[in-house]
A protein has these predicted regions:
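Conserved short loop/turn motifs at secondary-structure junctions
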Residues: 184-194, 354-358, 478
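Active-site and substrate-binding clefts of carbohydrate-active enzymes
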Residues: 2-60, 65-107, 118, 222-539
Length: 539
């Protein structure tokens, strides 16, 4: 009776935020992006894994936790600020339970109170402030496969120097080993942006696979025999898995995707704007400007104005999430049965999403996942959930194909990250990389203050390489912040470069930069050396 499944499903969640940490301020708006994702996505995902494991429900999920996110999760300052964040939310929720008694919003207020109590319990009692240990636990159980990403989510096809590509991959692999105690088996290339040949740098770090947008596989050479429904090997021997668009659209699509259902919670109406100012003020930032609290009392309702939204019903929404999970399972069964018949082999369907979709943008998304895992375990035998590593172990023989340059951005190539809103960045970025390579080659064995300065130069370069700055400029959201961040890292790198080349280091300024931009404490600037890059390319 063994092996009667007709195919495989690999669910891949990409968890990422840019490195945002501002010790120079008592509180900082953009740090809330991290705190919101912790409360709405990362801890709720762990909560699901805890419940499923406790009840004996097997599950498989692959999840990238990018190096900037790992560094923020492990940072002492951000951990303390996160505690302040969720304790304030819990205090507000407790007040709301009293205020909304005998109203349509009481059940929602109770929901938030229960939620924030659980967040505190998970963070303090389960993981003792070290959330990465929670993810590591499920990886060691074999239920979760954690993969890495470029060091700062750098957009690799626009890197002119291969030293920069090598640095992004090597730093990521080293940081992964530091946090998880072993090397990464897989990687999520930032923005699924693949440039032919860059996979040699993945191979050098022992990385066995990565993911591509559909056309990166379909337009490969020679033509892939099974489309995106089997991985291919690059000439380097690293496997590439292609994204399945059918399952993607059922969740992502703004028109037909599950998250748009009228019973689900409305993202854009928040208590921070609805309540009396004096009442809500203690829960705002020090500047007193109204902002999102994460507590929202209304449902999508339909295509109506925000002030016409109907009260949110948590029970109704949860029932809908269960229904959608059943529909998603049914569709995967039919899809895999069809592909099995058509291809004459067991296909693998790779469903890829931003992790923050689940719980943050789509509040009920975490309920959907929990129901889906349960239904897959108990209600069907057609589809087996696997990680990419498990699939490659079971099916090691795959076609050799050279995938094509591709991304998962709008129109499928580089336009989102290179256009009239952000093209001015690249002349600065290319020059910084060129200078960083020069420094790494010029000082192969620096020590003392010079070594610290060179390491900080490398931090500033990789922080400037983050694809998030170009993306935010294109989207027009947080445009001022992303511009300021890129300019700041450029200024800091250039200042350090001039001091190093002029042999006049200002240690006070260096200390300040080490305090502000403390990502990758383990940084070794020689990761940018031409010799290291060439050694990796030959491996």
């Amino acid at each position: 009776m063994a092996n009667k499944e007709k195919g495989y499903l690999s669910l891949v969640l990409h968890a990422h935020l840019p490195f945002i940490r501002h010790p120079e301020y008592e509180d900082f708006l953009e740090e809330d992006w991290f705190f919101e994702a912790m409360c709405e996505t990362y801890l709720p995902l762990l909560d699901i894994y805890e419940r499923l494991t406790a009840e004996g429900t097997d599950f498989r999920v692959t999840m990238s936790i990018t190096p900037p996110l790992c560094n923020m999760m492990a940072d002492d300052l951000l951990r303390e600020r996160f505690r302040r964040y969720y304790n304030l939310r819990l205090e507000l929720a407790e007040k709301e339970v009293v205020r909304t008694r005998n109203t349509d919003f009481y059940e929602v207020a109770k929901m938030y109170e229960t939620k924030f109590r659980r967040i505190r319990e998970l963070y303090e009692d389960y993981y003792h402030g070290h959330i990465l240990e929670g993810f590591k636990k499920f990886q060691e159980m074999g239920k979760l496969e954690i993969i890495t990403c470029g060091a700062t989510h750098g957009f690799l096809p626009l890197a002119l120097r291969k030293e920069a590509v090598h640095a992004q991959i090597k730093l990521a692999a080293d940081n992964y080993r530091k946090h998880f105690g072993r090397g990464p088996r897989g990687i999520w290339l930032a923005e699924c942006a693949y440039n032919p040949g860059d996979d040699v740098f993945l191979k050098a770090q022992g990385i066995r696979y990565f993911f591509l947008e559909t056309h990166g596989i379909i337009y490969g050479s020679p033509r892939p025999r099974y489309g995106v429904y089997a991985p291919v090997y690059c000439p380097s021997g690293v496997a590439a898995f292609g994204r399945d668009m059918e399952s993607a659209q059922q969740v992502w699509s703004a028109e037909t995707g599950y998250p748009g259902d009228h019973r689900y919670r409305e993202f854009y109406r928040d208590l921070g704007y609805d309540l009396e100012y004096d009442y809500i003020k203690p829960y705002l930032h020090q500047d007193g400007v109204r902002r999102n609290t994460g507590m929202k009392y209304f449902k999508i309702t339909g295509k109506v104005q925000l002030d016409q939204k109907a009260p949110y019903n948590p029970h109704e929404a949860r029932e809908m999430a269960a229904s959608h999970a059943g529909n998603f399972m049914f569709n995967r069964e039919r899809q895999i049965e069809h592909l099995n018949h058509f291809l004459g082999k067991k296909p693998i369907v790779v469903s890829m999403y931003d992790a923050e979709l689940y719980g943050h943008w789509w509040y009920e998304g975490t309920d959907f996942l929990e129901f889906f895992f349960k239904k897959m375990h108990h209600d069907q035998k057609t589809v087996k959930m696997v990680t990419p590593s498990e699939y490659l172990s079971m099916h090691p023989d795959n076609q050799v194909v050279q995938p094509s340059m591709s991304t998962w951005g709008d129109k499928g190539y580089s336009e989102v990250w290179l256009n009239g809103t952000n093209d001015w960045m690249y002349r600065h970025l290319h020059k910084q990389v060129e200078r960083m390579v020069e420094l790494a080659n010029k000082f192969p064995a620096a020590d003392g203050t010079l070594r610290r300065a060179l390491n900080q130069c490398a931090r500033e370069v990789v922080l400037g390489m983050s694809s998030d700055w170009a993306f935010l400029m294109t989207m027009g959201t947080a445009k001022n912040y992303s511009t300021k961040r890129f300019v700041a890292h450029t200024h800091r790198f250039n200042g350090l470069y001039e001091q190093i080349m002029g042999n006049r280091l200002e240690e006070g300024w260096l200390k300040d930069l080490e305090w502000r931009d403390n990502i990758f404490p383990e940084m070794d600037y020689r990761v940018f050396s031409t010799e290291e890059m060439e050694k990796a390319a030959r491996s």
